Amino acid sequence: MKISIIIPVYNAASTIRRAIASVDTKQNYEIICINDGSTDESRTVLEQLQKEHPNITLINQENKGAAASRNKGLAHMTGDVFMFLDADDEFLTSRIDFMADFYQKAEDVDIVLGQIAKGKHGEWQPIYTHQEIQKLEKVELAQCPDIMQSIGPGGKMFSAQFADLRFDEDVVFCEEHCFIITAYKKAKKIQLLPNIVYGYNEIEGSVTNQRAEQFESYMLDALKVRTRVMDLLSSKDERTYYSYRMDELIVSYLLQAYIEKNNVITKKLLDSVTTYINAMQKTDYSGKAMFRIIKVVEQGSKKWSKALYQQWRETLLSVGIGRPNYYRFKVEVLPKRAKSRGKMKLKYYLKR
């Protein structure tokens, strides 16, 4: 069996060698590195690695983003299965072959899904919210919507039958969701593994800061992706679970990152959130996710004017969610703000 490893590379000169060194399979394999217009020494490092490893294919392109880079890799892969690896991440020792064994011994398995851990090189912590899929079992999306908890490209081995799928190139936030959900829907069986197979090297603060800085465009991307995924999903259970995954675990924390940084309620913020809430009403959604978004906005922000609160209150009333009048809001809700912010900050770090 031949394994294709697809690695998008952008300004990863300091980490790409470690990432490639983690590809320790005994299977026949190819590594496809897509240099996405790097402005550091990534290309030089990759050219040197290509001399050292004849099974590395290097593709250079203008900067187009991770989605376009992965799509380029998919177009060039020749393996029976494929996997994705980010240039600053790594496979854990012997885990590629561990996954390959499960793939090869079951004809009905089209995807092998291992666990991802976050942290710094060698100091891995399992992702808290992935507990429901930490088991040795073959599942389908319809019976186990929880697999949408693992919605990124890492830690998975895909059958080559999915090589014609593509990542969304018109968004930069959550661009992997449609690809992953479509593959889950098409797969005959998905083999879950309780073992950590992939290490995500997290740079403290970088993700939070980026999300806060790109808040407006990320909210637009999230809404676009959410609409597409909801159209893909077949049942209310699937759509409600995806709402939890997207609306609560992604969008509400995107909001929280922005509010933690800016700490003031603005019309721009309210317009983004109310647009998103109105869109949620058009699909099945998680009530818990909805109320977390509301809590983040109300108890995380300050300097609410009467006019802004009235806009907010009318939006929620229009979707059947009652809110107190402005004066009761100031007396009953805002005093909870300081206590709530401490709790939300703790939960934020646990959920990441």
Pin down the residues of each PLM region.
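Short aromatic/hydrophobic "clamp" motif used to bind/position activated sugar donors
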Residues: 82
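A conserved acidic beta->alpha catalytic loop
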Residues: 22, 35-45
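Donor-binding/catalytic cores of nucleotide-activated saccharide
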Residues: 66, 87-217, 223, 232-234, ...
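Short, well-formed alpha-helical segments that are part of the catalytic scaffolds
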Residues: 11-27
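Membrane-interface aromatic/basic loop that binds lipid-linked glycans or pyrophosphate carriers
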Residues: 260-352
